[in-house]
Amino acid sequence: MSHSVLSSVTLGYEPIWDRWRKLCGVRLLVDTDTPDTVDARHLLAALSELWPGSSHPLLLSVRPAALLHGLLAQPPRPGIWLEIPDPQLSDALFAGRVRKARQQGLPMVWRGVPGQAPSNAAQAWLHKALRSLTPQEALQALRVSLRQHQASAMGTASGPLHSPVAAGSLYEGLASPALVEHALDRQSAWGVVGWPTEEVLHAYRFKQIQPARHLVLALVQAIDADESLETIEHRMGDEPLLTYRFLRYANSAGLGLLRDIDSVRQGLMAIGYTRLRTWLMEQLPHASSDPNLDPIRATQVLRARIMERLADAGVEDGLRREVFLCGIFSQVDLLLGEPLGAAILHLPLPGRVASAILGQTGPYAPWLEVAAALESGSTRVIREVCKAHQMPPGEVNRALLRTLAASAL
């Protein structure tokens, strides 16, 4: 039954990031064209089967009101939260179901319109609040942030400052790194839904982004611990920019290898741990410690891991590694600061990878387009892309949930 119910819904996702810029939860978008035919109990059972209850929360943002009503009537499931839109609380029947769900221990997250705070009545049952700022509130938050930074630089107290950002809440739609830093670092917000990727990268328009220092160090430590080739390969894949530079290094004339290296596995086997460690140590002095880049890297890796899962049933290990490279390099231009075509052509990648990234053609293109659609925030787009590529919704949903669950552990 869990397999059939996952075939009847469309799922999308938005990562939730904490003050350390690590994944602390996932907002799962749930939609269906036929809400009356989706059994809420079976849907929760299917999600629970694929989501480890001891990991980060899975926040269900359910579009059809009928399905949301049905989910409110179900017993709580470990690790699963339910988003409650404030406008629906005006319905007395719905509000009554919310109160009853609270009595049963269901964690619920109130969500309002920009600038809105939960009412006293909502405060009685909400587990968290998902808020957003109006333009005026965003400006006020930036002013407060500026005064806080000025006071810190001068070693003085900033005085009484009122920020519109509430401690312990989730926030969505924060459009700049300054707002994110104010919310997470200064005001102790619980988490941020989504990430201001374009604005973070804009700060690097005149300087080169470097691989993450903590991920380079983790690779060095893995080598020192004599971890397996598979583990080293997986860790390398957690850093898209480092993976790209490693393949450039493995194919450099100075290294003198006798053949093209078109995969991380080939490169690791050809170079060996000793030379790899030396090369990694050369990266460390220039490595980045900017935590605001971490969600950007992690999102790119999530796309690649989802593609791996989508391909899992149909390809052998070597081809699955190609699929991963296709995903991880599909946005590498954002980190390199150069056109995607030029970046891809610098590497001797298999034609299937290059054609999917640059031409949206070939056998890997459907997986890439579906993985990109899943992060779009639009269930309509997801449904249309899956239909265009004749990819069964149940298969896509299971790949998504398994990838998110593995990332949340």
PLM-predicted stretches and their roles:
Residues 2-81, 86-96, 272, 295, ...:
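Bacterial c-di-GMP phosphodiesterase EAL domain
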Residues 34-36, 64, 80, 88-94, ...:
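Short, structured coil/loop segments at alpha-helix boundaries
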Residues 4, 27-29, 34-35, 41, ...:
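Generic alpha-helical propensity signal that fires on short helical segments
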Residues 16-19, 50, 124, 200, ...:
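Residues in intrinsically disordered, low-complexity segments of regulatory proteins
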Residues 74-198, 319-322:
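The catalytic core of metal-dependent phosphodiesterases that act on cyclic dinucleotides
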Residues 146-409:
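Conserved alpha-helical "signature site"
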